[in-house]
Structure formats: C-alpha cells, structure tokens
C-alpha cells in the first residue's frame, strides 16, 4: 500500500511540474545561476533531511521527514535534468 501511495505522489509531482512549466516556464524566468543556486539549496536540504531522519526516534516524524526527503531528491533530479537539457550544466 505504501508503494502505491508513493507512486501516486510521484505521478502527482510530475503532473504538477508539467503544469508549472507551462504556466511559469523556469527557463524563461530564471538565469542558469539562479537554478544552480536552487540546486545547491535543495542539496543542502537533502543532507539536513537525511541527518534529521536518522536522528529521530518517533516513527511518524521519521515518515514525514522521509517523505520530504523523497520530494527533495525528486526535485533535485528534475532540476538537474533541466540544466543538462538546456546545456547549462555539463
């Protein structure tokens, strides 16, 4: 059951990202430096979520932190793909 819920969350993130790109195209509104800064911020968040997830003992908090970690990793992947696609990172 968890995997199907997680898969549906990932699909909804993908749909949201597609809609966001259509309504607010990232490549037209931000320069490569802005996106690289965002990528660095997300990487820092991933590190902090990892530490917090392993440090907490409460399973509900751990689950919430893990979900946030998954979202941050997914967003990092999407932004990295965008940077590579545009040739801004290589």
Curated annotation (Swiss-Prot):
GO terms for biological process: sporulation resulting in formation of a cellular spore. InterPro entries: Spore_coat_CotF-like. The keyword Magnesium does not apply. Keywords: Sporulation. It is found in: Spore coat. Pfam families: Coat_F. It comes from the Bacteria. Belongs to the CotF family. This is Spore coat protein F-like protein YgzC.
């Amino acid at each position: 059951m968890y995997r199907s819920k997680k898969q549906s969350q990932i699909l909804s993130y993908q749909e949201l990202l597609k809609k966001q790109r259509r309504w607010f195209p990232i490549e037209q509104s931000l320069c490569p430096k802005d996106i690289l800064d965002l990528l660095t911020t997300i990487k820092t968040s991933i590190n902090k979520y990892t530490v917090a997830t392993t440090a907490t003992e409460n399973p509900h908090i751990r689950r919430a932190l893990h979900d946030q970690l998954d979202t941050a990793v997914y967003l990092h992947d999407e932004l990295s793909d965008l940077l590579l696609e545009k040739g801004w990172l290589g």
